[in-house]
Structures are given as structure tokens and as C-alpha cells.
Amino acid sequence: MNEKTVKQEKELSAARDTFASTLFNEGARMEKERVLNALPEEFARLHRSGAFHIHDLDGWNLVNNCSTPLPEYVLHPEHLRTKTPGGRIAELVEQFKEMICTVQHRQSGGVGSCNFDREMAEALVAAGVEPTAENATAFGEQATLLFTWLSTQRLRYARENFYVTLNMGLDTSSWGRIVTHESIAAFAALPVDYTRPNLVFKVKGEINGRAGSPNYDLFLAACDCTTRKMIPTYLLMDAEPNRACDPFKINIMGCRTRVYANRNGEAGSVGRGNIAALSLNLPRIALETKELEKFFKLLKARMNAAKRVLLLRAEAIRKSPFAAEMAESGVWSAKNVEEMCRQGTYSIGFIGLAETVEILGGGKVQSDPRARELARRILEVMRETTDGYADETGLNFSLLASAGEGISGRFPKMDAELFPDAECWKKGFYTNSFHVPVDSGVGVFEKLAYEGPFHRFANGGSISYVELREAPIGNPECVADIVLDATSQGVPYLGINYPLDICNVCGTRGTFDACPHCGSKNVKRIRRVSGYLETLDEFSVGKKAEERNRLANSGNHRE
């Protein structure tokens, strides 16, 4: 694929308002209305009014959210047709690509690979491909083609890139190390606006997190790539919420989804996924009550409504031929849709905890100990409640620290209509999950120290970000320091952000309003939204407002 072809394909697939995408959008809008009209009036009203948000309504009675396919579904070294090592490598990567297409069109959310390094390594060994320097180069070339395809082709709903998350870093075999090294190197070498897939580097002290450990060099390579492209993000296996997990059985799906504990089978992420999710508007509950006792009473009522919605959805999915096809295809360890619904997770999420605490008179969470204690108590009650639902139903209910990409702007807009005198909505967005407000300006380590203890409540998935003033290019030690501190603070999953601007005229990169080299204001701005990187013009209204308010977490990280 030559440079001209790549550019043409990227320009063609970047046009979101195509016939196919327009047709899909209209169909999705109509399906959402149909679902809401069919729901019990109480639940439809809560969604329409912005009291909570039912995610992926257009797939209500059709498909699950996200999954991590079984390795044997993805790669089939026994079916390779070519005899040369390079041909076999290319075929295996093509099989992986075919899996992405198939699974992404069978569900509403992202697809993950739990151990991309180990799974690909085992397939390469089974295919008889030796871990030579020549074959390592061949794999790197195929990784480059795969990542280019994921970054440039908007094949999801004819308008979006596929949501793919590759977890890696723990395999110490020859091929496992090659897969990790070449994947990171391939991603680092691609243009900075090539932002797919999301690479997640698993950090485990004795394997790669300490000097002298077998894969420490790969950890440093990952840190160096992060200084240039904000990817990889880091799954911290020695952090308190992950410590009891088998590091080879847990991974991130999508931008933060965590699937591990299992009441109805073996614990782990592989061959499982999230069935459905719903997010609560916490500030709305505070605005409606203004007093703690009433707040907790209404919180439990809203969570109970959320539970009933998710149970209705599970019942609808049990009757879906599309869900049955997914269950019976070998993607999941479940053999039928009933077992799939028992093995999967049901997540109740939330956004706006910082605003909620302030409405209730607790002050600023980043500076007031009373506010932090109230935030902790709210999370504790929510986790106790979801655990109670799991006990009651026998299903895997969990608490999700929602990203809130779409709802971060939707919720405050609707609250403004109901509470025009409230201050919380005036900035145009609500803060992600339990995060420190983006305009707090607290230091890196202070932010991690505040958010760290809250992660243990969010067993359905969570992430902490730190926002640097600029890309720490050439300083991977900066990233390593932050990763190690986040681990000690109990952060299970970490992302490192910074503004990344690219001049569309001359290619200069940095942080600027106008290009310092040629003066052009034709600038592409790449930022992290939720878990994935996007160009700023693709952000939702709420996330654009959030980005305008972001301040760097400066003052206490190594420059």
C-alpha cells in the first residue's frame, strides 16, 4: 500500500456523512424511539429526561455491548495455506483482522484481546514460524498494515473506526517479546494522527515493571511510545484492585470496561464481555434532593430502576437471534445465549461525582477532606447496592466509572432546563465518574493520590488520567515514574494525556494555536476523549467544553 493510496483511502473513509452512515443514523434514531416507546413509561421518562442514560439503545433487544473473544476463535494456524514464514505471518494477521470485522458487526461496543502477545506467539509457533530477525521484521510490517487499516478505515456503521484494544507485555517467550516489541515500534512509527488500536501495556513487577525483569526493556519502549503518541495506556497488575487477579486472564475492553469476577463460572475476561450498561446522572439526584438523607434514598431508587432496566434488557437479548448467533459462534465461552447472559456483566455507571458533592455542600473534592469523605461514602453505597443486586439476581452486576463521552454534555443541558439557577451545569459538562475536575490544576501525584482509593469500588471498569502540559518526548522516565506512583496509589488502569497539535500544511507537531514554522492555522488537534484518541472536531459538545477547561496536572512530575 503506497503513501498516495493510504492518503486517498483515509480521505475517503474520513467523510462521515456518507449515504450509508446517514441511512444508519436515521435507522438508529428510529430504533431508539421504538425501544423507548415500548419500555415501561417510568424508564422511558427517566432516560428522556436525563435522569439516567441507557447506553446503546439501538441494540436494546439485539446484541451485547463488548467482548474478549476466545483465542481459538480468532487464530487458526492449522488452516494456513501458504508455506513461507512471511506468508504465514500475513495470514495470521489477516485472521485477526477478520475477527475484528466479524465481532464488531455483531455487537455495539469494543473488542479486546487479552494477551495479544501470547496468543499471536502461540499461533506463530504452531504454524512453524521461527522467531528470527527476518520474521520479526515481517511481523512488524504486518502490524503496521493492521494498525493503518484500523486508523484509516471508518467501517463501523460506515462512519467510525473499529474500537479495538490490544493488551500485551507479559509474554516472555521469544515470539511473545517480538510481538510486543514490533507492535509498539509499528505504532510509534506511524503518523501521530493514526490512533488505533488502543494498545494496553500490562505492568507486573517481576515480569516487566522493575529493572532486571525479563521484559523491562519492553516497558521502557512502551513508555517512550507514550511520550510521543499517548499510547500505550497501562493496566497495572500490582495495583490493589488487580493484585488478586491472574494477569493473563484480565484485560481492558473498549476504553475502560473491566470483566473479571464471575458468579456463574471461571473468573476472567476471556470468552466473556459486558451485556449492557446504564449511567446515572448523579448531579440530578443532588439537585432534586439537596440534603444527604434524601439524596441517598433517591440514589437507591434510581439504582433500583437501573437494575430493572438491565434485567429487562437481559430478557430481550435472550430472545435475540443475533445474540444467539454470537453465543453459538465460539466468540464467548458460553454455548448458548442463556449462558452468555449469565456469564456476562451488567454495569450501572455514573458521572459527575465531583459536582454532586459540591451541590450537597461538601466543597471541592480536590481540596476539602469532608468532600472526599462524602465522595467515598457515595461510592461505597453504590458498590454495596450493585453487590446486593448480584446476590439477589445471581447475575454479574457491577459498578462502572463511566467515561460519559456523549452524556457529559447531555446531562447538564437537560439539568439547565429543570434547574436554571444551578451553577453545576454552566460550564457545559459534568466530570467523568469520580475524577478530580479537569480545571483543578492539582499536581500529577496529588491527582493519583485522590483518585486511587476510589477505583476499588468500580469493579465494572475505571481509569485515571493525568494531563501533562506538553508531550514529554525523550523522557520515558517521566512516564515510568507516573506508572509506578499510580500503582502504589491503587490505580488499576492509567492513561497519560497531553495536547498534541499537527500542522496540516507542513507537518510540524507540538502545542500551538498557529504553526510556529509556517504560521498556518490549519491545525489538527488530537486529544483523548474517554479512552480513545480522537481529533478535537470529532468530540461531542460536552467533551469539547471539557477540553476547553482542561488544565495540566503540573508541578510535581519529573520534567
Feature map (PLM): residue ranges:
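Long insertion/accessory domains within large nucleic-acid-processing enzymes
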Residues: 519-559
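Conserved catalytic cores of very large enzyme subunits
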Residues: 2-342, 363, 368-525, 534, ...
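Glycine-centered flexibility sites
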Residues: 349-352, 460, 531, 542
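Contiguous, well-ordered alpha-helical segments that form the cores/surfaces of helical PPI scaffolds
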Residues: 118, 346-359, 380
